[in-house]
């Protein structure tokens, strides 16, 4: 694992010493930014996972079967993106993957509510592919910040991600009931713009 490069073993009194790459204050700040990125990612992903089929049926009048096939295409894209995010981060750096995956999805998410059926499918595939590649990079970046708390970091980020997705599904469902399903995607389309906070993430130098 990449984060093991930051672990220094010292044979003093039989103890293992682990060096943090940043000060405690900068580490907390960086983790807060990463959680903000998880927040934006999983709100938008929840809108697609939970309501994409209803959106297609309502806006384009497609059948239930067709809408489910379109959802399957989106889910395939998310699987590919998730698998690709880690190796790409190893090659070009976690921060660059986070930049590209969160903020890079913004043009697609902003455009999707304003195009026809075919382009909606194409853009949703692009969003799924790009946005899903963020989580492996975010998780590994966080583990590099706290290499001696890998279990804590994994639990925190997975728990926060699932929690945000669950709450977002309920909130977005209520929004759809009051303002219409199209309003959900008009609003959620702006969520990837929170990727701009990646600017404040420090660069972790390889040792």
What are these regions (language model features)?
Residues 1-13, 198-203:
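C-terminal membrane-cytosol helix-exit motif in multi-pass small-molecule transporters
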Residues 27-82:
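Extracytoplasmic gate region of multi-pass secondary transporters
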Residues 42, 46, 128-136:
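Small-residue-rich segments within alpha-helical transmembrane domains of MFS-like 12-TM solute carriers
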Residues 81-93, 176-177:
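Helix-to-loop junctions at the C-terminal end of transmembrane segments
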Residues 96-111, 189:
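Structural signature of the two symmetry-related core transmembrane helices
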Residues 118-127:
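Paired small-residue
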Residues 133-146:
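Intracellular juxtamembrane helix-capping segments at the cytosolic ends
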Residues 143-181, 185-188:
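A late C-terminal transmembrane helix in Major Facilitator Superfamily
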């Amino acid at each position: 694992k990449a984060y093991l490069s930051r672990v220094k073993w010292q044979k003093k009194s039989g103890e293992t010493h682990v060096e943090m790459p940043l000060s405690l204050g900068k580490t907390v700040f960086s983790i807060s930014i990463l959680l903000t990125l998880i927040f934006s990612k999983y709100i938008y992903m929840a809108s697609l996972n939970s309501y994409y089929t209803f959106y297609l049926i309502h806006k384009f009048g497609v059948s239930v079967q067709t809408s489910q096939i379109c959802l399957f295409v989106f889910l395939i894209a998310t699987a590919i993106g998730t698998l690709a995010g880690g190796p790409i981060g190893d090659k070009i750096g976690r921060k660059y993957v986070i930049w590209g995956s969160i903020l890079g999805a913004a043009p697609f998410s902003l455009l999707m509510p304003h195009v026809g059926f075919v382009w909606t499918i194409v853009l949703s595939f692009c969003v799924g592919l790009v946005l899903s590649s963020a989580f492996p990079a975010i998780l590994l970046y966080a583990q590099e910040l706290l290499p001696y708390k890998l279990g804590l970091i994994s639990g925190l980020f997975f728990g926060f991600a699932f929690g945000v997705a669950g709450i977002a599904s309920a909130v977005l469902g209520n929004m759809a009931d009051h303002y219409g399903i199209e309003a959900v995607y008009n609003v959620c389309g702006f969520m990837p713009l929170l990727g701009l906070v990646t600017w404040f993430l420090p660069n972790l130098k390889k040792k």
